[in-house]
Every structure is written in C-alpha cells, then in structure tokens.
Amino acid sequence: MDMVKVNSMDFGEFVDVFGNIVEKCPLIAAAVWSQRPFSGLEDLENHFFAFIDALPRSGQEGILRCHPDLAGRDLQQGTLTAESQREQSQAGLTSLDTDDRLRLQQLNAQYRERFGFPFVLAARLSDRATVPRELARRLQCQPESELRTALGEVKKISHLRLTDLLGAHSHSARVELP
C-alpha cells in the first residue's frame, strides 16, 4: 500500500486498516486520520507517536493496559489480536513448555502488580529465551523509567506494524504535500 492510497482513505477505511497499530487503540488511528495528508511512513508514524506522547500518564498507562500478557491467558484462550498472535508466535512464545509458560505467567503477575500494567515488549525483536530475562530485569526498574521503556516498546511494535502494512512503499515512496 502506498501513501497516495493511505491519504485517499475515508475515515472508516483508515480506522479499519490502522486501528490496531497501537494494540486495541483504534481511537488513536481515528485521531491520526485528521492529520492527513501524510508525506510518508515517518510522517504517519510521527503522528501516532505524538498522540501517545501528548496523553497524560493515565492515558499512556491505558494504552499499556490494552496489551496482552506475553504467553498469557489471551494466548491460551485464542483471543489475541491477529497481530499479537503473529508477533508472539514469531518470538516462540506460542510453543513454550509448561515450566517456561508458568515461569512467564509468574513474572507477568509480579510485573503487573508492581507497575499496574502488563509487561510490553516488541516480541518480534526478541525470542523465547530473552523475554523472561528482560521481564525479570525490568521488574527492577523504577516506575517512571519503566513507563518510558514500555511506551518505547509500544512505539517499536507500532513501527513494525506500520512497516508491515505499507510494505516496500514505506521507505521509498514519499508524497509531495502542497
């Protein structure tokens, strides 16, 4: 999909296509649509990120709370979004043995208890061995620092999802704006 197509989308189509760039947060896509036209991937991405950055802390935490636990209940029940299912699968989290899954569930619960939102990590940039180590490491972080780190992971996930949608056109096709 190229940027000309993106810029020509009506509101409903744009939200349908980009509504899960930030996990379960179609409101962000709805707000970003109003910023058209976009000159390219980076411009579109910057509008998503600016929306996140402009939110008060409660809104930013809300975005984090929309993410599923890695290898958690949603995975076990088959209720992950298609994007999260694919990302967790690529990281090897859909095929953990029982001991690894239980360990990750325990760490996820400790993290959620400490910070008030689930552990967020760009799973596609990780693997099944790294996830629990990173979760244990981040459990030691201060809340303010961890909020920034988790939001950074949301942005990594969003970048990957936007790149997936825009494909080969994402880096090469730029639209000249009036």
UniProtKB/Swiss-Prot annotation:
GO terms for cellular component: peroxisome. It holds the Pfam family OHCU_decarbox. It comes from Mus musculus. This is 2-oxo-4-hydroxy-4-carboxy-5-ureidoimidazoline decarboxylase. The gene is Urad. Its main location: other. It catalyses: 5-hydroxy-2-oxo-4-ureido-2,5-dihydro-1H-imidazole-5-carboxylate + H(+) = (S)-allantoin + CO2. It is found in: Peroxisome. The active site is at residue 67. Pathway: Purine metabolism; urate degradation; (S)-allantoin from urate: step 3/3. Catalyzes the stereoselective decarboxylation of 2-oxo-4-hydroxy-4-carboxy-5-ureidoimidazoline (OHCU) to (S)-allantoin. Substrate binds at residues 68, 84-88, 119-123. It comes from the Eukaryota. Keywords: Decarboxylase, Lyase, Peroxisome, Purine metabolism. The keyword Lyase applies. Its EC number is 4.1.1.97. Gene3D superfamilies: Oxo-4-hydroxy-4-carboxy-5-ureidoimidazoline decarboxylase. Belongs to the OHCU decarboxylase family. GO terms for molecular function: 2-oxo-4-hydroxy-4-carboxy-5-ureidoimidazoline decarboxylase activity; carboxy-lyase activity. One of its GO terms (biological process) is guanine catabolic process.
